[in-house]
Amino acid sequence: MSRSATIDRQTQETQINLDLTLDGCGEACIATPVPFMNHMLTLLSRHGFFDLTVKAEGDVEVDDHHTVEDLGICLGQAFVKALGDKQGIRRYGAATVPMDETLASVHIDFSGRSCLVFNMDLPKAKVGSFDVELVEEFFTAFCNHAGANVHVNLVYGRNLHHMIEGVFKAFGRALDEATGLDPRIQGVLSTKGKL
């Protein structure tokens, strides 16, 4: 059984093609008009041990918002499709990652219920040309379209780049844990019998 998905999203604001393979080795080929997101998605794939190919175009002449949000939408949809009925997955994942002076933590539950708890007090600032407030937009879009409960906690940090990078690395590791198959799990990990 191949746990993979292809998502095509075509709107008047963005055109995105995304391929995801859960049981990969962390290979990424990311081409979007938002360089900082290219970096974040590449390390997300690497630290999550899933293969990810993304080709995106967007109305970045307006700003990066639509592209970043739609990347979150597509990634969330891809996880839903790749996980299928969620038979045998661990469901929960958690990771805490240091990134130099930063410590970041992400917890996830593929419960089928969308909820984001985002405890990063980010200033209205930029890393390069990237508006850091778009990090929350990405995670909101992912949660809404993955049916996932995600808690993002920045424990501490000073450098904005390190803070965001630490969160994406922790997110990758948490995704790897939550989507991993466990032979002890018969059906789905829920007393309801369905996720």
Swiss-Prot record:
Pfam families linked to this entry: IGPD
Signal peptide: none
GO cellular-component term (any): cytoplasm
Top EC class for this record: lyase
Pathway(s) where this gene product acts: Amino-acid biosynthesis; L-histidine biosynthesis; L-histidine from 5-phospho-alpha-D-ribose 1-diphosphate: step 6/9
GO MF assignments: imidazoleglycerol-phosphate dehydratase activity
Catalysis: reaction(s): D-erythro-1-(imidazol-4-yl)glycerol 3-phosphate = 3-(imidazol-4-yl)-2-oxopropyl phosphate + H2O
InterPro entries in UniProt: IGPD_sf, ImidazoleglycerolP_deHydtase, ImidazoleglycerP_deHydtase_CS, Ribosomal_Su5_D2-typ_SF
Cell location: Cytoplasm
Protein keywords: Amino-acid biosynthesis, Cytoplasm, Histidine biosynthesis, Lyase
Keyword Transcription belongs to the record: no
Family annotation (Gene3D superfamilies): Imidazole glycerol phosphate dehydratase, domain 1 (3.30.230.40)
Enzyme Commission number, as recorded: 4.2.1.19
GO biological process, any: L-histidine biosynthetic process
HAMAP family in UniProt: HisB (MF_00076)
Entry's family note: Belongs to the imidazoleglycerol-phosphate dehydratase family.
Designated name of the protein: Imidazoleglycerol-phosphate dehydratase
Provenance organism: Syntrophotalea carbinolica (strain DSM 2380 / NBRC 103641 / GraBd1) (Pelobacter carbinolicus)
